[in-house]
């Protein structure tokens, strides 16, 4: 039986109790307060549910991650980067990026990024936990992604693309910046063919948990807010 979270506690069940099917389902209920969300990510748990349903909390096995030094840049993406087709910024329009990620897509029915999610993660953004990467073509937002940073781990949430290689460009800029800050891991949650093209690999839940304990506790020696970052444009 899946446990319901107490509204009076930020504790979660042990992730080893997560179901095998559906893979990683751990708990229901609770809320999306900044405190609970940070507590969840520190434990390798994330919310994922359809609007109107109870909040569902997940910790899948295996876990899909990208080690920054193993990020794969394809030849076509490298050409795009060298041509300087796009301009990339950080933390310039967080809510707009989330709404773009929430927009309907031809290959998916509906979206799990509700107004409730946007409101909650925007609060995390205001507190310096959640960050966005924006990809611009002229003055048009054509790609981007968002996620959370805790210690030396970035927890990716979602990305979108409205132009060729736009989201991959944003991810490449993010990875390079995280490398400069000595980030050790990018959590991608669950596998997809798209993520594997970026160099993602799968690791066990136990291995992921060990990395969480070590790397989320490392001191933050990078800015709380990223909007003043001026990314290097040469590739």
Swiss-Prot record:
One of its GO terms (cellular component) is cytoplasm. One of its GO terms (biological process) is protein catabolic process. Its EC number is 2.3.2.6. It is an enzyme of class 2 (transferase). It is found in: Cytoplasm. GO terms for molecular function: leucyl-tRNA--protein transferase activity. It comes from the Bacteria. It catalyses: N-terminal L-lysyl-[protein] + L-leucyl-tRNA(Leu) = N-terminal L-leucyl-L-lysyl-[protein] + tRNA(Leu) + H(+); N-terminal L-arginyl-[protein] + L-leucyl-tRNA(Leu) = N-terminal L-leucyl-L-arginyl-[protein] + tRNA(Leu) + H(+); L-phenylalanyl-tRNA(Phe) + an N-terminal L-alpha-aminoacyl-[protein] = an N-terminal L-phenylalanyl-L-alpha-aminoacyl-[protein] + tRNA(Phe). InterPro entries: Acyl_CoA_acyltransferase (IPR016181), Leu/Phe-tRNA_Trfase (IPR004616), Leu/Phe-tRNA_Trfase_C (IPR042203), Leu/Phe-tRNA_Trfase_N (IPR042221). Keywords: Acyltransferase, Cytoplasm, Transferase. Its main location: cytoplasm. Signal peptide: none annotated. PANTHER family: LEUCYL/PHENYLALANYL-TRNA--PROTEIN TRANSFERASE, LEUCYL_PHENYLALANYL-TRNA--PROTEIN TRANSFERASE. Functions in the N-end rule pathway of protein degradation where it conjugates Leu, Phe and, less efficiently, Met from aminoacyl-tRNAs to the N-termini of proteins containing an N-terminal arginine or lysine. Belongs to the L/F-transferase family. This is Leucyl/phenylalanyl-tRNA--protein transferase. It comes from Cellvibrio japonicus (strain Ueda107).
